[in-house]
Amino acid sequence: MIIFTDSAANLSPEKAAQLKVQVVPFHLTFMGKTYRDGVDIYPKDLYKLYTEYPNEFTTTSQPSVGDYVSLFEQHADEEILTISLSSGLSGAYSSAASAAHLLPNQKITVLDSRTVGPALGWIVEV
């Protein structure tokens, strides 16, 4: 079985590798440029941008259905468990569930963690 979560779990790349968890990145847009959280930009980079441009704001968007489909298809021969950020806070759960629906021949379970941040990370760790 392979476990997926989204970058809202705040797992470091090292922790994700240790747990053998695949992290699906949220998209962050700052000053018109979009980054994949934990891939193209990291918290320290965001902090630096915020200090350089204190009047600018970041917008976020959940991973798309296509993001999930692409990753799920890479693991077509494995059972997949996806633990997502709370559906009450984001559309990440909906994206993952829609992707699973599009791949009926794969064994994919999508779980709404109903939480965020370190609490989501702890669920993934257990």
What are these regions (language model features)?
Residues 40, 58, 62-66, 90-93, ...:
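Electropositive phosphate-/nucleotide-binding environments in soluble metabolic enzymes
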Residues 23, 82, 108-110:
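Conserved beta-strand scaffold positions in the cores of enzyme catalytic domains, especially
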Residues 2-64:
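N-terminal glycine-rich anion-binding loop in soluble enzyme alpha/beta folds
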Residues 5, 82-86, 112:
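Short beta-strand segments
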Residues 89-126:
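Active-site histidine-anchored catalytic micro-motif
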